[in-house]
Each structure stands twice: as C-alpha cells, then as structure tokens.
C-alpha cells in the first residue's frame, strides 16, 4: 500500500512509536519501567499480528544497546543515542530532546518518502518529539500522556518531590498540538479537559489490556512452592517500583497491624525512591516485621503471574495511577486486589466484587481493608476470586488494539480532511 492509499483508505500500514525515557524491552519494576513499557510493547506486538509494522524509538541507555533490535517480524526497536548512556535522570532528559529528535529524523530520512503513516508518542517527552516529527513528515500525531504532572502534584506522598513546572508547560503544548489524545479512562479524559482544556472531540478512551495467556488462575500451593514461600501463611503482595508515589510503605505499616501476615514486595527502587534504596527494608525493621517481609527483585511476566497466584491478595496503594495494570494482572490470576480509590483503579477494580477500593492512605483503614479480604469466609473468597478473573478477562490486548486502531483511523481521516481543506 502506498502512502497516498493510506490517507485515502484511513488505514495505517506503518507506525512510528516514540518512547523517549524508557524502552519497552526494559524489565518492568526497574528504573522508570512500568505499565507504560508493557503497554507500548503489547500494542506493538498486536498491531504487528494484524499486518501493521511498528518501529519504536527509545533512548539508548547502554553502549551495548544495538542501534536496531528486531523483536518479532513487524516490530523493531531503534535505540537512539541522545546524551550519556548512564547517569542521566529522567528530569534531565528535556536537555536531550533535540539530540533524540535528530536521531528519529535521520532514521526516517534513510527510508523512501512517506515511510511512516502515523506517529504515536507516549509520555510528554515523546510528545515534544512527536510534534516535530508530525510537522516534518506531514502525518498525524496521536499522543498518550500516561500521567499528568498536575494530577501527580495534587496527590504527592509525604516527602516526595513535585513534578517541575516545565513539564506542565510541555504537556500543555503536546495537548494543543496532537491530532488525537488517547487516555486510559473517562476520568483521565475529564482531567485532560479540566486541566489542559483539551477538545473532548479529540479524545479517545482506550483501556489497557492484560495478557490472558500469561496471567491466569493457578494452584496457590504449587505457586508458593515454586517461589519458596510458606504454604500456611496469609500473603499480601506488592508489585511495582519502590518509590513514594506507589506507597509500598502503606502496605508494610498496615500489615504490621495484622499478626501472622506475610508481605512480599517485588520491585526495584525508582524515581525519588533511589535516594534511599534500602528505605523499605529499614522501615520493616523499624516496624518489627522484617521476619515476615520477603523482598524480591523485579520479576519476569511468568514469574509475576506465579506470584499473583501465590498471594491471597495484592495491594495497590498508589497515590496516583492512570490505570493500574498490576491490579488487572493480579485479578486475571484470580487474586483479589485492595487498591487506592484513585485515577483508573476504580475501573480496574470493582469495589466489593473483585476486591476493595480504599479512600485515602490512612494506615488503619488499609489494615481494615486487608483484614476484610483475608478473613472473608471461604465461599465469599472463592466467589471474589472467580469474579476477579472474569472481570480481568474483559480487558484483552486484542480489545485494546481494536480501540487503538479506531483512534488511528480517526486521526488519519481528520488529518486528511484538514489537509485537503487547507489546500482547497
């Protein structure tokens, strides 16, 4: 299909995906890698299965990173050299956007004109580069923010650092320039409209998905045996980056009020959590619960599924969460979730049906929520487990890809109409 045919049929054949600050191939739970990485990789894989080629541009973070990594047929990751490989904080990345953009434009220049049909940027840093690429290549820009500075700053954990003003300015520019804006939930759409005055007609709600081939119910005792966890203890799992935003300390403080409960923490320090990488272990010691806290490094997807199967429940106490893939993945394994009633978590978790939503971060309230799930009668616990798995099964990456493609088609159609109007 030629480039002109793409705009005639509103059907993309090749997508340039921008993920400046973190590679989709990075292990979630380390550094800046999390749900966004999973989202970018899974949507790319599913687009490729439908015959749409995807090239993902990300910043190289090691000298050993090859310029091009072929993930599967139809999915390529391009590691763009922009700034030093190591020691560059995410907050310093705006200084390297020019270098990154130059690398993206050079890659496109090596192809025939009209190589990419659409640009999809993830996070505001990528949106800045996408804005330039959109104008240079004369193709539409679709943008997914994933998080917003104003939302994060309104719900900071104690002692956490606020997002800088330059990010708010940068996000506003991207919202103004993008042809379409993709959000995870209706709540996120309302935030874009109220904070950044986004045009509601340009917003598409696209729920993230879950890999139902990996995350599925399994035998709890077998899962615990595989991970070397006690067979006869109640287990509460926390999975994610160790940083104030994710509030792992709330899980420890709440569990300290529940004798006999084991806490499993899987993840690595990130963001402001890097300032005190041993902080959570020190807190466990201060609370006198070190003997019943198990720390695990970030886990592969199959191992993560095993951990979810092993746990009685999973806690997601984040101060801000645009969706909460961890909550969805846990439920896909039949494991109830106790989650903060923030952001997209009320969509990911059905309160009282697949888990519990907790208002605020009062430790006593969290202890009561965890205890309520752990002490539920066996029939009620089994019913909640079944409901959790059934709820998660409605969120597949195939459904996500359907909605994503619909947004791409709208972007191409509207861009084509606007371009013809300008030329008329």
Curated annotation (Swiss-Prot):
Q: What class of enzyme is it?
A: transferase
Q: Which GO molecular function terms does the record list?
A: acetylglucosaminyltransferase activity; D-inositol-3-phosphate glycosyltransferase activity; magnesium ion binding
Q: Which UniProt keywords apply?
A: Glycosyltransferase, Magnesium, Metal-binding, Transferase
Give the Pfam families listed for this entry: Glyco_trans_4_4, Glycos_transf_1
UniProt-listed Enzyme Commission number(s): 2.4.1.250
> Where is 1D-myo-inositol 3-phosphate bound in this sequence?
21, 32-37, 90, 123, 147, 167
Question: InterPro entries under this entry?
Answer: Glyco_trans_1, Glyco_trans_4-like_N, Mycothiol_biosynthesis_MshA
Catalytic activity field: 1D-myo-inositol 3-phosphate + UDP-N-acetyl-alpha-D-glucosamine = 1D-myo-inositol 2-acetamido-2-deoxy-alpha-D-glucopyranoside 3-phosphate + UDP + H(+)
Residues annotated as binding Mg(2+) are: 308-309, 311, 335
Q: Name one GO biological process term.
A: mycothiol biosynthetic process
Please name the SUPFAM superfamilies in this protein's record: UDP-Glycosyltransferase/glycogen phosphorylase
Role according to the record = Catalyzes the transfer of a N-acetyl-glucosamine moiety to 1D-myo-inositol 3-phosphate to produce 1D-myo-inositol 2-acetamido-2-deoxy-glucopyranoside 3-phosphate in the mycothiol biosynthesis pathway.
Q: What is this protein called?
A: D-inositol 3-phosphate glycosyltransferase
Q: Which organism is it from?
A: Mycobacterium avium (strain 104)
């Amino acid at each position: 299909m030629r480039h002109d045919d793409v705009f005639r049929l509103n059907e993309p054949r090749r997508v340039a995906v921008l993920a400046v600050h973190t590679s989709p191939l990075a292990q979630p739970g380390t550094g800046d890698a999390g749900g966004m990485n999973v989202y970018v990789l899974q949507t790319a894989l599913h687009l490729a299965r439908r015959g749409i080629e995807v090239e993902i541009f990300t910043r190289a973070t090691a000298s050993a990173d090859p310029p091009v990594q072929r993930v599967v047929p139809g999915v390529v990751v391009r590691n763009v050299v922009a700034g030093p490989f190591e020691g560059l904080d995410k907050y310093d990345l705006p200084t390297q956007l020019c270098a990154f953009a130059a690398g993206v434009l050079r890659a496109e220049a090596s192809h025939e004109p009209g190589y990419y049909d659409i640009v999809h940027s993830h996070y505001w840093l990528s949106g800045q580069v996408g804005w330039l690429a959109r104008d240079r290549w004369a193709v539409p820009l679709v943008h997914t923010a994933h998080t917003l500075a104003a939302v994060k700053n309104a719900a900071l954990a104690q002692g956490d650092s606020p997002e800088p003003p330059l990010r708010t300015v940068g996000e506003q520019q991207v919202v103004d320039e993008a042809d379409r804006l993709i959000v995870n939930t209706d709540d996120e759409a309302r935030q874009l409209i109220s904070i950044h005055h986004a045009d509601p007609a340009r917003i598409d709600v696209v729920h993230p998905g879950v890999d139902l081939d990996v995350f599925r119910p399994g035998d709890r005792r077998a899962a615990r045996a595989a991970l070397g966890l006690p067979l006869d203890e109640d287990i509460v799992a926390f999975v994610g980056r160790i940083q104030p935003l994710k509030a792992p300390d709330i899980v420890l403080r709440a569990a300290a009020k529940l004798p006999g409960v084991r806490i499993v923490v899987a993840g690595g320090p990130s963001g402001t959590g890097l300032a005190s990488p041993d902080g959570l272990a020190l807190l466990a010691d201060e609370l006198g619960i070190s003997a019943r806290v198990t720390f695990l490094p970030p886990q592969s997807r199959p191992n993560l599924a095993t951990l979810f199967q092993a746990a009685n429940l999973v806690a997601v106490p984040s101060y801000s969460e645009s969706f909460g893939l961890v909550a969805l993945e846990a439920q896909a394994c039949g494991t109830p979730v106790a989650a903060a009633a923030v952001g997209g978590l009320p969509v990911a978790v059905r309160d009282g049906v697949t888990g519990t939503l907790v208002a605020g971060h009062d430790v006593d309230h969290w202890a009561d929520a965890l205890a309520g799930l752990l002490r539920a009668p066996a029939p009620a616990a089994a019913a909640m487990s079944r409901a959790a798995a059934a709820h998660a099964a409605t969120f597949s990456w195939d459904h996500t890809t359907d909605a994503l493609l619909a947004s791409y088609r709208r972007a191409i159609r509207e861009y084509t109409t606007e371009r013809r109007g300008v030329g008329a």
